[in-house]
A protein has these predicted regions:
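N-terminal glycine/serine-rich phosphate-binding loop of ATP-dependent small-molecule kinases
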Residues: 1-97, 125, 153
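Glycine-rich phosphate-binding/catalytic subdomain of phosphoryl-transfer
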Residues: 57-173
Length: 173
């Protein structure tokens, strides 16, 4: 029989499910993690501990509890909180904690500056949304300005989902 595994990494927990070809839940698991708040207005996750280790723990737990042969899992779907910002080096290793979506507002100054420089109308026309604490672009600008040594070591900036996909496939998406 064929199975599909789905794992979702959320703000406060990771949950996963294994379903058969008919969509019947065979096994499920969840694991809590913390949102770090190193300063007021900041929100972070530890990518290794909170994203990757949770993903592996949930996968192993679901497979063990289901008793199925892992080779019968034909697809793995992953979703994760976003949009997040995670700088990685050329080996794909995180250079800092992942900066979370709209709950992290460290780049408020950059949001204001970019909106003033580009214009709200043009941003809306090109992006379909205003720049907010949800936007990754201003967070990247904040990172460049405030962490120049880490920025120089950055090979790519990933989302939480692209970090998981890279760990699974050694590919960047």
């Amino acid at each position: 029989m064929s199975y599909t595994m789905g794992i979702d990494i959320g703000t406060y927990e990771t949950k996963g499910v294994l379903v058969d070809i008919k969509g019947i839940v065979v096994s499920e698991a969840k694991r809590k993690h913390k949102m770090l708040v190193p300063r007021p207005g900041w929100a972070e996750h530890r990518p290794e501990e909170d994203w990757w280790n949770d993903f592996c723990f949930i996968s192993k737990t679901i497979l063990k509890e289901s008793g199925i042969n892992p080779e019968d899992v034909k697809a793995v779907a992953s979703s994760a909180i976003g949009p997040c910002m995670l700088p990685v080096n050329s080996s794909g290793n995180p250079l800092m904690n992942g900066v979370l979506y709209g709950v992290d507002n460290r780049a408020e100054k950059e949001v204001r500056e970019l909106t003033a420089a580009i214009g709200e109308d043009l941003i809306l026309k090109k992006c379909g949304n205003a720049l907010t604490s949800q936007s990754v672009g201003p967070k990247i600008l904040w990172f460049k300005r405030n962490c120049p040594k880490l920025y120089e070591k950055t090979d790519k900036i990933l989302t939480s989902t692209s970090f998981i996909v890279h760990r699974l496939t050694d590919q960047y998406v």
